[in-house]
Amino acid sequence: MSKVQEKYQISPIFVFFLIHGAQFGAGVLGFARIIAKAAGYDGWMGVVITGLCIHLLIWMMYFLLKETNGNLIDLQRQMFGKWIGNIFNIIFAAYFLIVSISVIRTYVEIIQVWMFPTASTFMLTLFLCLVSYYIISSGFRVITGICVISIGGTLGYLFLSLFVLKYSHWDNLLPIFTHSFSDILKSAQLSIYSMTGFEIYLMVYPFVKKPMQSHKYAQLGALFSNLLYLFSTLLAFSFFSEKQLLKTIWAQLSMTQVIQLPFIERLEYIAISGYALVIISSFILPLWASMRATHEIFRVKQRGILIAFFFITLIVSQLLTNRHDINNFISNAAKVSFWLIYVYIPILFIIVWVKRKWKKSKAQAN
């Protein structure tokens, strides 16, 4: 069992910030275009469907963790045994690392496209790795503190969005239901990876005091993030025509260009720099989860694992040289996310639920 000393644990209310910090990141800047490809401006319904699925999955996760009284590593070892369980654990550790790399590389690309076109991918990635090393090596409570601070970046994002509202044309959303239900489901599937991150709680559970009391805060954190994604989608749909949106990679950043302030010429510079608060929390959490999982599987020092992961991040970032490579990497990560989170977790839930019912009926028979 994963036992954590109380001095390293956090209060249940902070789970709100952890879920939001992991879930709301770089994906929101461009996912409106992605879902519009599948269902046009009915794509917002796909966001609602994904949001509802997330709340259901969080409930399943709490059920699983309560039955195990440990984290994901303990759960899979109990269900499948040490060897097979560790195979699944390694898969999840790799998945969390992939998520972290995808967020880092996406943010580096945004900096290069919008701010410094000649900036070195290696140097920008190295800087982000050094920042994350300092935060993660300081402990989980510091990571939680960063997630709390990142709310400031989210509020800044909302503040800028209010300036864009006066340029919105809400009749763009009409008529609704112009696409088939299968198209809407496709848009829901395409929004999954951008809205993922809540699964981080599978590793966080032992670090929370009275973890079952944090369930409502986890649901509220997910609700806050889901509403932000829905708001961002509707805002992008109302601001751009459908043809314009399909040609705009980072819709949310493009919208800031219409905001005019007398003392700032390039507001997107401020927006991207400020949004770093949000981005940092969305890549240090999966990186920490991957490090923690690897530590519990192989029983090696966490600092050594973290340094090794930074080398992997630097190498992979260098290999992703253009938008096509980055997009393929993220698309493949999204497929892995779908199968691990939206397929595997419900299957695991069913197995544990059936096992629990069987044990209960067996006990009553005796």
Question: What do these predicted regions represent?
Answer:
Residues L97-S100, I104, I136, G152-F177, ...:
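Hydrophobic alpha-helical segments and their helix-loop junctions in multi-pass secondary transporters
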Residues V28-T121:
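Membrane helical hairpin/interfacial module
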Residues K37, T106-Q112, L128-S150, F207-K210, ...:
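Membrane-water interface regions at transmembrane-helix termini and the short interhelical loops
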Residues Y107, F122-M123, I135-L162, A333-P346:
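Membrane-interface loop-to-helix entry segments
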Residues I10-G30, G46, I54, F92-F96, ...:
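Hydrophobic, membrane-embedded alpha-helices of multi-pass small-molecule transporters
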Residues M1-F31, A39-Y41, F207, I351-N366:
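Membrane-interface "cap" regions at the ends of multi-pass membrane proteins
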Residues I49-M60, F96-V103, V131-S132, I151-L165, ...:
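Selective recognition of specific alpha-helical transmembrane segments in multi-pass small-molecule
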Residues F239-E268:
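Membrane-interface interhelical connector segments
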